[in-house]
A protein has these predicted regions:
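A short, basic N-terminal segment
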Residues: 1-45
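Mid-core helix/loop region of P-loop NTP-binding domains shared across ATPases and GTPases
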Residues: 1-6, 10, 14, 29, ...
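Post-Walker A helix-loop "phosphate-sensing" segment adjacent to the P-loop in P-loop NTPases
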Residues: 66-77, 108-110
Length: 196
């Protein structure tokens, strides 16, 4: 059908993203689905999706998000629900920048000079309000771009969010993301590595 379209439309069709459900991608989606349906408890399972650059990690996450977005909107038209929240780790992984990225992802206004405690409370309240069931943090390897103390603070933030929200956290990144998580003993045993 696309071959019968005008040149511009065919070119646009060829350049568009395509989902190619190779075996490892399908099994990763299945694992994400298991986490999505996990009942809330004190210590939730987390996942660390590891793969080389241009290996389809972000495409898998976007497909997972799309698969859950329309259901939430259709069933709750009067209240916005965001069951799968996807945020990218900032290039400089400070706690305040991460909260700012999360708030922007949720479409929330933010005071430019808000303190971390304020950002934290607003973010937690919003994530609960939109009934987030899973938090995906893409480009987690960016954590290594920070100085040692900034890196530790960011990794502590991941542990805090997991404890506070009681939802699974999925980290996505290159092997450097695995090295970052392994640098914290408590986080290492909370994140199940999944190699693509």
């Amino acid at each position: 059908a696309a071959s019968l379209q005008p040149d511009e439309e065919r070119i646009e069709y060829l350049r568009a993203d395509r989902w190619i459900g190779y075996t490892r991608a399908r099994s990763t989606l299945q694992r994400l689905e298991e986490l999505f349906n996990w009942p809330s408890k004190q210590r939730m399972p987390n996942l660390l999706i590891i793969g080389s650059t241009n290996n389809g990690k972000s495409m898998i996450i976007q497909k997972f998000k799309r698969d859950h977005l329309w259901v939430a909107v259709r069933e709750h038209a009067d209240h916005e629900l965001i069951p799968v929240v996807v945020v990218q780790t900032p290039s400089e992984p400070s706690v305040s920048r991460f909260y700012a990225m999360l708030l922007a992802t949720l479409g929330a206004p933010m005071h430019p000079r808000a303190r971390i405690a304020e950002l934290e409370q607003v973010t937690l309240r919003l994530l609960k309000s939109v009934q987030a069931k899973i938090l995906v943090i893409d480009e987690l390897h960016n954590v290594l771009a920070g100085a040692t103390d900034v890196r530790k603070e960011f990794l502590n933030l991941l542990r805090f969010l997991g404890n506070e929200l009681r939802i699974p956290i999925v980290g996505v990144g290159t092997k450097e993301a695995y090295l970052a998580v392994r640098s914290d003993d408590q986080l290492e045993n909370r994140f199940e590595p999944l190699l693509l």
